Amino acid sequence: VYTALRQLGLGAGTPIRIAADDQGRMKPAALQDALAAADGPTIVCAQAGNVATGAFDEFEPIANACSSYDAWLHVDGAFGLWAAAAPATRHLTRGVERADSWAVDPHKWLNVPSDRAMAIVADPDTHIAAMSLAGPYLVADPGQRDNTNYVPESSRRARAVPVYAALRSLGRAGVAELIERNCAQARLMAERLTKISG
């Protein structure tokens, strides 16, 4: 977030850090207070899977607060958003569907090459308004989807092919099994590490 704000010329001092618990989960009451004091357009960045602890923010109360103050809710789900695909972990993402936008990195859990990050926006018209390009050399076919309206680059290589191939190969059940197996492996590793002295 801080890097993106600097690149946009808004400066790293722009964001207001919301109080969090010891696992890095945003405190909804603190968010409510910050939104009540905010002046002007506001973006709230919640997280599905804290990079240091794996913790998930509580999306329902965060979405309620954002809705009350007309704030845009973005969920950084770089690796954790995939938890929604598995029955055993889906509860962690309860309410995430209420966000306005999401980010996910398929390489972090689907084992595809890096540089496959995706931004998903709930309202297609808002997405197109933010991304569309114009130029006399950009001629769109009125009967076809114009992909230049969905990405910041006018042209790019087919980054989605490995993601499509992984999803097609694994299927819904395979993705769910991958998520649940990896979580079980992480719990086993944590359990074994607690038995090591020092």
Locate each region found by the language model:
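Active-site C-terminal subdomain of aminotransferase-like
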Residues: 50, 69, 85, 94-196
